[in-house]
C-alpha cells in the first residue's frame, strides 16, 4: 500500500453550549492515499462538514492527531460557493493564483482548459449571477 498523504487518528470535536456538550465527531481515524477518491457520507448532523473544516484548518479538533505529508495542499469546496459576483468566471478562477503570485500564461491556459473540461468554457466571460448552483460550485 502507498504511503498516506494524510493520516487522521482519533479525531474528535466537542462543542460546548450553555445547555450541553455536543459531540460532533468521535474518534475518526483514516489514512488518505494519493489518487484515491474518498466520499464522506452520512445523515445531516453526523459530523461530515466538521471533519472537512478541521482538515482544511477552518476549525480545530478537540482531540486527535492530523499528519500531512510535507508540502501537501488541500482544496475544499464549501457547500455554499464564495464567488465574487462582480468578477467574471475567469477572474474568480484566477483570483487565488493572483494572490499567490502564481499567475502566468501557462496557469491561465490551464484554468481555461479546466473550465472547458467542466463544461464552463462558454461562460468564461460571464458573471456568477447567470450560472446555475451546480455551475457556481464547479467554478469554485
What does each of the following model-derived ranges do?
Residues 127-131, 135-136:
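Conserved ABC ATPase signature
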Residues 56:
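Helix-to-loop junction immediately C-terminal to a conserved catalytic motif
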Residues 63-74:
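Conserved ABC transporter NBD signature motif
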Residues 41-43:
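The feature captures the beta-strand-to-loop junction immediately N-terminal to the Walker
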Residues 39, 139-140:
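ABC ATPase nucleotide-binding domain "signature" region
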Residues 87-94:
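Short coil-to-helix segment of the ABC ATPase nucleotide-binding domain corresponding to the Q-loop/switch region
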Residues 73, 94, 105-123:
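Conserved ABC ATPase "signature" region
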Amino acid at each position: 500500500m502507498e504511503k498516506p498523504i494524510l493520516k487522521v487518528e482519533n479525531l474528535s470535536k466537542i462543542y460546548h453550549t450553555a445547555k450541553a456538550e455536543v459531540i460532533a465527531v468521535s474518534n475518526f481515524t483514516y489514512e488518505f492515499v494519493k489518487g484515491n477518491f474518498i466520499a464522506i457520507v452520512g445523515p445531516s448532523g453526523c459530523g461530515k462538514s466538521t471533519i472537512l473544516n478541521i482538515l482544511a484548518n477552518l476549525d480545530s479538533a478537540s482531540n486527535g492527531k492530523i499528519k500531512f505529508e510535507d508540502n501537501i495542499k488541500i482544496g475544499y469546496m464549501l457547500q455554499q460557493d464564495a464567488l465574487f459576483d462582480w468578477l467574471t468566471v475567469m477572474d474568480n478562477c484566477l483570483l487565488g493564483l493572483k494572490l499567490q503570485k502564481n499567475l502566468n500564461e501557462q496557469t491561465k491556459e490551464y484554468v481555461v482548459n479546466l473550465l472547458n473540461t467542466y463544461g464552463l468554457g462558454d461562460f468564461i466571460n460571464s458573471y456568477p449571477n447567470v450560472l446555475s448552483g451546480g455551475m457556481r460550485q464547479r467554478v469554485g
